[in-house]
Amino acid sequence: MVHLYYWLAASLAVSASNLRFIDRNHPQLIPPPSNDPFYAVPGNIDTFSPGDIIKHREPPSRISAYGWTPTHLQKAYQILYRTTDSQESPTAAVLTALIPRDADYNKVISLQMAEDSATIDCGPSYTMLASAQENPLLMSNITQLQLLFAEVVLARKWIVIVPDYEGPKGSFAANKMTGHAILDGIRATLRSNHITGIEPNPKMGLLGYSGGAAATQVAVTMHEGYAPELEIAGAAMGGLSSLGNASDIFSINKGPSAGLIPSALLGLASQHPELQKSIDESLKPEFREYFYSPLHQCLQASSVMFYYQDVLGMFHNESIPGLKAELEKAWDKETQHKAARIKAPLYVYQSVVDHLSSIEAIDALVHGYCDRGFNVHYERANSPNLGHVKYGLVGVSGAVSWLQDRLDGKAAGVGCSNHTDTTSTLDPDIAALYPRNISDALYAIVNAP
């Protein structure tokens, strides 16, 4: 995921470079969330209920994807709201509400963007800003790529909310923090009419791909147990991970995505002190500063730093079994939320040649959902040229079309349905939403061998 996203985003950045004329002057640098008082969890956080709005503001910098502000975006708001961390303690998170021109205030999509980072400074509320793109450690081409997904939704006049679901500690891989923040973000959205104009009971859908799909999956799994009052019309998630156990993350060691290992361990450890202690005690002293670098940079920088690195080799050999045991303990605590049922209809879209996931494992996941009586449409793409990133670009069209029916009030069929997706090209209607330089780059990447 990391290296392909990076390659795609870098290609887009080059192709879209002459779009910088939109803002010839460098945007004024603003402090990242770790130094911005707006993001601070207030001392009286326990006086707020989950989903309560604490404060709001307009973004302090222009929202930008490769130098281009989404055409259908009219205004935006950042909202700090109360949520709950993995230890069941009150905390706060930020969401960004993107309001399109001529908005339908009765239709909202919660877009979970892949973050895959272990610091609050990589939350999309910050990395979608032009100012963040001036910081080489905190710039996120992955966020900019996913803003292209947001434009697909905004073009339908739906409102998009984007939660910083990793919370104030950058708790990547901490499922409970993630699910709470997404669901409480929806609660906050329903209470935001005086800020956003969103109606109190809109049709609500969820959308996420890759790391954003994992977050969406957690949210729908926790929905019934944590926020049963919420009505979710449907959830679309694609490019799901097939990792079953926490220690499976080490299977990508010495590979192009090895940077996910320190980010995931540090993100999870932010919610689990015993895991943090094990990491501290297991690291070789000469690698300590190197390993902890993801606490100060986003996925893009970490992916370059750890590209094909032996991350496991940074730990004392005799300490690795104990480290893995603590990792599994923390993960088990994070996954104790398995729901009796998933209430919302699901749209799962997956490429059979996704190099990050075993298609057999995703097939088994979907079949398990069906056996438990969940409502699932499974879109299984069999084109041999659609890897993980390519199908993210190609598959979003079908996902949003499915969400259109759900938000329009059309019932999703009872039970499960499967469809083989033979599409292998970018939807021209989606490509037309972007400036020529960006759409040309997307076509070139999707059509590449």
Kindly label every feature range from the protein language model.
Residues 1-20, 449:
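Fungal secretory targeting signals
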Residues 30, 238-339:
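Accessory cap/linker subdomain of secreted extracellular hydrolases
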Residues 85-155, 164-166:
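Short, surface-exposed "cap/lid" segments of acyl-processing enzymes
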Residues 143-148, 155, 172-195, 214:
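Alpha/beta-hydrolase active-site loop
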Residues 187-260:
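Primarily recognizes the serine-hydrolase "nucleophile elbow" in alpha/beta-hydrolase
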Residues 323, 328-331, 363-449:
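C-terminal catalytic histidine-bearing segment of alpha/beta-hydrolase fold enzymes
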Residues 342, 347-354:
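Short beta-strand/loop motif that positions the catalytic acidic residue
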